[in-house]
């Protein structure tokens, strides 16, 4: 079998396609959650803690002071952008919560399905029956 043929068989298997769809949907979901955090959640949290915009919180590790984060970045100053880290952490927590809720719902659906009935045992083959009869006859002698 050629390399290309093997790759086609691998790529067209159901679980590989499912994985690809999951990655694409996950990427889109990540963008939605990122927007939710940056544009909805963090402005509300910032307002509740005194009008702070978390995106602009940073520590300047250099000796020169700058008015804004953008000015410090433009000058190439060494920075610790802990506001961006807070945003990313909240972003992660929301994604983790959404995945947890989705998996919990899927598991609940799986539990509510009745278990599949156990298959009936296959009838014993004739040669096995004959061998048992011979064994039993030999035991009685």
From Swiss-Prot:
Keyword Cytoplasm tagged: no
Keywords assigned: Cell inner membrane, Cell membrane, Ion channel, Ion transport, Membrane, Transmembrane, Transmembrane helix, Transport
Assembly behavior: Homopentamer.
Gene this protein is translated from: mscL
Membrane-topology descriptor: Multi-pass membrane protein
Keyword Cell membrane among record annotations: yes
Cited function: Channel that opens in response to stretch forces in the membrane lipid bilayer. May participate in the regulation of osmotic pressure changes within the cell.
Main location: membrane
UniProt superkingdom: Bacteria
Cross-referenced InterPro entries: Mechanosensitive_channel_CS, MS_channel, MSC/AndL, MscL_channel
Lineage: Bacteria, Pseudomonadati, Pseudomonadota, Betaproteobacteria, Rhodocyclales
Taxonomic source organism: Azoarcus sp. (strain BH72)
Residue ranges crossing the lipid bilayer per the database entry: 16-36, 83-103
The protein's name in its UniProt record: Large-conductance mechanosensitive channel
Family affiliation: Belongs to the MscL family.
GO terms for MF: mechanosensitive monoatomic ion channel activity
Compartments reported by the entry: Cell inner membrane
A GO term from the CC aspect: plasma membrane
Pfam families, per the entry: MscL
